[in-house]
UniProtKB/Swiss-Prot annotation:
InterPro entries: SecB, SecB-like_sf
Gene Ontology biological process terms from the UniProt entry: protein folding; protein tetramerization; protein transport
Keywords: Chaperone, Cytoplasm, Protein transport, Translocation, Transport
Highest classification ranks of the organism: Bacteria, Pseudomonadati, Pseudomonadota, Alphaproteobacteria, Hyphomicrobiales
Pfam families: SecB
Any GO MF annotation of the entry: unfolded protein binding
Protein name, per record: Protein-export protein SecB
Gene3D superfamilies xrefs: SecB-like (3.10.420.10)
Subcellular location, record wording: Cytoplasm
Function of the protein: One of the proteins required for the normal export of preproteins out of the cell cytoplasm. It is a molecular chaperone that binds to a subset of precursor proteins, maintaining them in a translocation-competent state. It also specifically binds to its receptor SecA.
PANTHER family named among the record's database cross-references: PROTEIN-EXPORT PROTEIN SECB, PTHR36918
GO CC aspect terms: cytoplasm
Gene name tied to this protein: secB
Length: 168
């Protein structure tokens, strides 16, 4: 005789095992500017200064579905002259189920962007290569450190807001 429900040995139903699924990945916004072309494509004596910015945002879509957007921007300059500017917002729709509530923010702001990053990195590399420059291969990003820094900044903001509220 078989039963259709899983149990943990004491007759009660088990919680479903935690799962993280990617339902979709997409380019939300992509921009590449090469304002000095074709002069910017000429050989130069030194490497350009490259400034890279990274941001992650997450928004709920449904009970267990979330839209996570990894934003990457990079500017290359030779002195004060802009060589290129690339901006990418790369999103993923994730289904997150069976995780304790205290694990949700780390999942959304560390694990989800970690899964999106290789694809976003390739898009940026292709855009810079297609713009006439060597492909920009962004180094791996420590999303755990970014998340910790973000949480620390939000804690400070909350403390300042509480101090301002009690002072009024």
């Amino acid at each position: 005789m078989t039963t259709d429900s899983a149990s943990n040995g004491n007759g009660s139903a088990q919680q479903p095992s935690p799962s993280l699924n990617i339902l979709a990945q997409y380019v939300k916004d992509l921009s590449f500017e090469n304002p000095g072309a074709p002069r910017s494509l000429q050989a130069r004596d030194r490497s350009p200064a490259i400034n890279i910015n990274v941001n992650v945002n997450a928004n709920p879509l449904a009970e267990n579905d979330f839209d996570v957007v990894l934003s990457l921007s990079a500017q290359a300059k030779d002195g004060d002259k802009m060589l290129f500017n690339v901006e990418l917002a790369y999103g993923g729709v994730f289904r997150v189920a069976g995780f304790p509530q205290e694990h949700m923010l780390p999942l959304l702001f560390i694990e989800c962007p970690r899964l999106l990053f290789p694809f976003a990195r390739q898009i940026v590399a292709d855009a810079t290569r297609n713009g006439g420059f060597p492909p920009l291969m962004i180094d791996p990003i420590d999303f755990a450190q970014m998340f910790a820094q973000r949480m620390a900044e939000e804690k400070v903001r909350a403390q300042v807001a509480n101090t301002n509220d009690t002072a009024n």
